[in-house]
């Protein structure tokens, strides 16, 4: 006797078009935060009277913050609600855009860019939300491809728009544009997506988040400093790497003790876990 399982039906356009609009708007908002500013860096130097190194540091701060927030926000979304977390991310990112837009100096700009980094895990969170609402495998694969392709770049339009805005209205107009899109994303995600959580929602492992964030932050900063080669402060690189190792050691020990770990120790002991993480880390470091 054979049994057949029917594949879930595809969503109708009236259902998936609003959903995709909301998710793509959120992805657009993050992508603009990441790439739209690149053509405006020289303009920022002139208007703020800053050096190339200072402006470059603000970019590094954004991407480092994005990486750190990506460690725990998707998991937090599993526990308290993915839509709630994504809406909060977009709202905070919009606030960061406003701070950056009105920044009188590089120090305030740096703070604004760090706040904007909260949007870092936008894409994985959007893909999880998409999976929760699109149950048909074929349709999900197609829509997933659309979302991830947008994250790879908006056909160069983001860079061209950033260059045009900075050239005609100053670099602050770029941040105001980002803020508007983040605000639109807040409304779209709240209206057009459904709330979802994991099947089980235990307490968030904040004890594990802290040492892991410190460890990864130190390692990323060390790699960034080492990338300067002859101009690098190698003593600082060594200190940061040592702190990173200590942070990972603390994270390992915390995860062995908590009831609901951020990453189960059983996974940390598997070679395939470290092979995947190492490959990803080295690849992105090369980029």
Sequence positions of predicted segments:
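Central cavity-lining transmembrane alpha-helices of secondary-active solute carriers
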Residues: 60-74, 124-128
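Hydrophobic alpha-helical transmembrane and interfacial-helix anchor sites in secondary transporters
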Residues: 44, 76, 164-165
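Conserved MFS/SLC helix-loop-helix module at the cytosolic interface between two early adjacent transmembrane helices
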Residues: 67-104
